[in-house]
């Protein structure tokens, strides 16, 4: 696929997030609220891709666990995003098992590992979409590709972090994410994206 390993993609507020988490671990409730406000939008978008309308309830359960286990977390702001995504994913899968429903995009699991840098056509295609449009289109991808795209674009994880969330090898996650983003770009008629849109996507309207 010609992909290159990329350095970790820092999110704009990761520094602020890391500081807030550190203060929250020392008992600062206002700092925990700051961390929540930074992380919650992406986490909720990820959960919507997994459990649909039940995302808010699952997110509430996840945050209870995050608050309870906060003292055990070690890492920076980017690490906290990955840690919270892992907890949210476990709660989502528990929820789906209880309901005995298959994940809408079970492989909403994969990520986006080491994709080409932040300004490539695939990212631009997704950035042009609203969250609602993105989730609708992502829901039409194969499961592994869908979750990979959600972790990269909605949660904002880098490749290695997404691989840890999913318990998969970086290479497998990287490939799934690349293919998922390429399919989405092709569906959107993104300029400069050619060829191999897999048939699965081409068949859906």
List each language-model region with its residue ranges.
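Sigma70-family region 2
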Residues: 25-26, 49-53, 61-80, 98-100
